[in-house]
Amino acid sequence: MSLFDWFANRRKSHPVTKAQPEREISDGLWSKCESCGALTYTKDLRANQMVCLECGHHLRVTSDERIAQLIDAETWVAMDNNLVACDPLQFRDRKAYCDRIQEYQSKTGLQDAVQTGVGELDGLPLALGVMDFRFMGGSMGSVVGEKLTRLIEHATQNRLPLVIVCASGGARMQEGMLSLMQMAKTSAALDQHRTNRLLYIPVLTHPTTGGVTASFAMLGDMILAEPKATIGFAGRRVVEQTLREKLPDDFQTAEYLLSHGFVDAIVPRPELKRTLAQLIRIHAQMPMASDVSPAAVPVAAAVE
């Protein structure tokens, strides 16, 4: 038997098995940084609030994770969890809007793209809204606008500081004009909150764009942003095509907006809770924060 025949027979009797594929990174044990590609033990990454230990890149977090990062344990009381979007326009693109809503509700466990409620931050009571980009890109429709408006009105009546963590692609196109009117509705509610000289701090995370940027995201007394967050109204390519000129590489980043006076501070996520607590305490010591009686603003929300 030739050597060639021996190898051929051996291959038949001992077939070569395919190498086992590498273990998926998404199994939960390790996480890969979207910026530098570093592999980090997920437990360590979560301990650092989903900020890369190598390059400082801020990975996206869910609204539940954000609430846990900011609110003291066992103090969170959610509001208006029963609100669900309807489909007045009977909108359909590749699938019906109502089917798309149900799909995202199943994927995220949320009713819509924002969670609202009250709780304590470092022992300080406040009203908090947290947008979740996982739910249709954090787009603002009727439910998001209504929940935020009720939250703002609740904060006004109860003289609470207000924090809204923004993460959105803008207005929800599937609701047409009904989504656009939420910009005016939330802005009007914030004007009442401001008239009562109460503190409102929006926190702009990646990304904050479109109708959210053009409304409540930019109406704060102090506007904070996470490092390297994309913040703007229209997309970069749209702006370049409209202006017909090349934009700076850092255009529409938190750092660019800070240098041009559109945000007041860039705060790394691990320092956010401490920074918010400091700002709330400073505002509480100001005479104007306690000398004004609450305005008679109707409050539609009831804490569940």
UniProtKB/Swiss-Prot annotation:
It is found in: Cytoplasm. It is an enzyme of class 2 (transferase). One of its GO terms (cellular component) is acetyl-CoA carboxylase complex. GO terms for biological process: fatty acid biosynthetic process; malonyl-CoA biosynthetic process. Its EC number is 2.1.3.15. Its main location: cytoplasm. Gene3D superfamilies: 2-enoyl-CoA Hydratase, Chain A, domain 1. Residues 29-298 form the CoA carboxyltransferase N-terminal domain. Keywords: ATP-binding, Cytoplasm, Fatty acid biosynthesis, Fatty acid metabolism, Lipid biosynthesis, Lipid metabolism, Metal-binding, Nucleotide-binding, Transferase, Zinc, Zinc-finger. It catalyses: N(6)-carboxybiotinyl-L-lysyl-[protein] + acetyl-CoA = N(6)-biotinyl-L-lysyl-[protein] + malonyl-CoA. It comes from the Bacteria. Pathway: Lipid metabolism; malonyl-CoA biosynthesis; malonyl-CoA from acetyl-CoA: step 1/1. Zn(2+) binds at residues 33, 36, 52, 55. Binds 1 zinc ion per subunit. Belongs to the AccD/PCCB family. Acetyl-CoA carboxylase is a heterohexamer composed of biotin carboxyl carrier protein (AccB), biotin carboxylase (AccC) and two subunits each of ACCase subunit alpha (AccA) and ACCase subunit beta (AccD). Component of the acetyl coenzyme A carboxylase (ACC) complex. Biotin carboxylase (BC) catalyzes the carboxylation of biotin on its carrier protein (BCCP) and then the CO(2) group is transferred by the transcarboxylase to acetyl-CoA to form malonyl-CoA. This is Acetyl-coenzyme A carboxylase carboxyl transferase subunit beta. The lineage of its organism: Bacteria, Bacillati, Cyanobacteriota, Cyanophyceae, Acaryochloridales. The gene is accD.
